[in-house]
Amino acid sequence: MPLSNNYRRILAALLGAVMLASCAPTVIPAGETVRAPALEDGRYVAADGTSLPFAVWLAANGAPRAVILGVHGFGDYRNAWEEPAEIWAAAGITTYAWDQRGFGASPTRGRWAGTQTLAGDILAVARLVRARHPGVPFYLAGESMGGALALVAADQGADVDGLILLATALRSRDTLGPVATGGLAFFAHVVPWLPVGPTSIDFQPTDNPRTMEKLRKDPMILRYPRVDLGYGLVEAMDAAKEAAPHIAKPYLMLHGLGDRLIPQDPVRSAIALMPRRPDSHLGFYRDGYHMLLRDKEGPVVAKDIVAWIDDKRAPLPSGADAERTRPELAELWGSKRGG
């Protein structure tokens, strides 16, 4: 007996639901706790036993006067911090960085770990690094996605003395718009395995040809991520947007005016809600792109960071303070916080 139209609709709906369920975005969060987290032989070993490559650039001439923990961006890995770390080392600052889950040489490369798992790793690594350097000023630095995750970790009580936010990924769903957000959700649930491109490399993330060449040749760069990895990134940016108004530490927030990946509109939306503090700065670089620390003027940015660590109330040496480069954004800063 042929099926009625109603039965066909019900079966089609059920089949569609099964297909969507079977193709949900892949998330590989941290597993059960099996040990105490530790830094061992160039690795960060998490509480669930996951082992992630870890790097350190030691301060020149002995004990550091400050320590920076770097959190890399989407598709990147620990070596994102190599160039600025050399400048900071010469200034007496030690830098640490690791490959986050899903990136670099991590065992789950190409799979999203979940915002809370990634933020949890930041909290754990920060505790371990802080324990290595008791009494030394300690800063959490994040680039792009790393900046978003740094905001989330700070909101969850990361034990640091300040935040350094570089080209922070703040393109939350409310700034992407319903079409882009809906399209991403559709593809992430229907074909989560689909590799997407072009990646940030093809959107000219820097004006530095040497950096571009290194990115193209480096096998550790994730060039064609799955669409569900991008869906996870948006989740992280949503969480960062929610966390941004609650920053309770000094912070240095830097963006390039030539950034094609994180345009000014999402930045404007976030800074209007962020606390305006005398020990914090907004900086905008006229010739800056997305990878500020690896641009042609990367050393200028790295030295601004050193200057801020030394004196948080003084203007940045480069003149990048928003009051000089983008006074309208300086005026917007903290303007929508209310009472």
Placement of each model-derived feature along the sequence:
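Catalytic active-site module of serine/aspartate enzymes centered on a nucleophile-bearing elbow/loop
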Residues: H281, R286-G339
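Catalytic nucleophile-loop/oxyanion-hole region of alpha/beta-hydrolase
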Residues: G75-R78, G104-P134
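An N-terminal hydrophobic leader/cap segment in hydrolases
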Residues: P2, L14, V18-A46, T50-A60, ...
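Short beta-strand/loop motif that positions the catalytic acidic residue
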Residues: I247, M253-H255, D259
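Short alpha-helix in the alpha/beta-hydrolase fold that links the catalytic acid
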Residues: K249, P263-L273
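Alpha/beta-hydrolase-fold enzymes
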Residues: A141-R226
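Conserved alpha/beta-hydrolase
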Residues: A85-T108
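The serine-hydrolase catalytic nucleophile loop
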Residues: F74-E86
